[in-house]
């Protein structure tokens, strides 16, 4: 699981990384953690890499957490977003970006284990794959990418999200 954390407060970022690593270890979850102190750099990374979980501060200079979340949603990237902020006023505004959760910085440590358990369950369910054989070998498709399966003239057609988006054959 690839987890990215973005917060402009270097002290909080360091503390959050330590606490998150402790929670991941206690829950026996293997993850790759990457930390960013600016939203600008993270936006570039989101375009190039697949990220499973984003922990985002909201109030940051240049590019705030909402702009990052908006960019992620527009690109239809399939990552879970968790906002982490000092301002509980942002909770309702955050719904616009379909977050997985919202953590208040003042008591995030109490909630983090539960949030990570739920994230792990969701992430595990997304990893499931459908495998089938064709001439020349096997093919794997992520179940979450399958829209529907139909048949015609004794042939099976699997319609997937990438097929619809890119209009390419598998």
Go through each PLM region and give its residues.
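Short hydrophobic/Thr-rich beta-strand motif most characteristic of the beta2 strand and flanking loop
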Residues: 24-37, 45
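CheY-like receiver
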Residues: 41-125
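Conserved binding/recognition cores within well-folded domains
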Residues: 114-170
């Amino acid at each position: 699981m690839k987890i990215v954390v973005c917060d402009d407060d270097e002290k909080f970022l360091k503390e959050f990384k330590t606490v998150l690593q402790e929670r991941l270890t206690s829950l026996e979850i293997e993850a790759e953690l990457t930390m960013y102190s600016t939203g600008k750099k993270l936006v570039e990374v989101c375009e190039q890499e697949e990220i499973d979980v984003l922990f985002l501060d909201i109030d940051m200079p240049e590019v705030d957490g909402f702009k990052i979340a908006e960019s992620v949603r527009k690109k239809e990237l399939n990552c879970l977003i968790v906002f982490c902020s000092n301002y509980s006023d942002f909770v309702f505004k955050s719904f616009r970006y379909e977050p997985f959760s919202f953590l208040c910085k003042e008591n995030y440590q109490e909630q983090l284990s539960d949030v990570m358990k739920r994230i792990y369950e969701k992430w595990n369910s997304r990893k499931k794959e459908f495998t089938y054989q064709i001439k020349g070998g096997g093919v794997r498709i992520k179940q979450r990418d399958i829209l529907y399966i139909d048949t015609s003239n004794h042939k099976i057609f699997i319609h997937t999200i990438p097929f619809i988006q890119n209009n390419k054959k598998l």
